[in-house]
Amino acid sequence: AAAELGNISDRRSYLLLEGKFGLPRLLTESSGLNSGFMIPQYTTAALVTENKTLCFPASADSIPTSLGQEDHVSMGSISGRKFNQVLGNLENILAVELMFGAQGLEFRRPAKCSKYVENAYNLIRTKVEKLEDDRLIGEDMLAIAELIRERKFEVI
């Protein structure tokens, strides 16, 4: 389910970049001169694919242990580690979607959204400023992912 949520988030993010719905392509005013949010979408696509591979069941490959007394081992510890990685990747995927959403709202101003969306937008803007020109934005993704990990969006 976590891997699928990441896939859905990536597809929603992609829709924001297409240049439809009255938003500029790549969520930048000068997409010919700037890459906008092209690279973070590559990142989410890679993380989504990684999550799909991590969801292959570890129990599909069992090996006898304990001098043959344990003929089928669940590989539960491996599954737990893989799931932890999927969740970390999902946090980054969702962070990119939130970053794209905040940028998209910039092009809708002065219109306002619901108080919940505005609160989320304001929280994001405490960590990440609007993208005007190309810059390194990996730290922006990590800052929003940290907000997710800290459950800051739950109080909105």
In which residue ranges do the predicted regions lie?
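C-terminal auxiliary extensions adjacent to catalytic cores
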Residues: 1-156
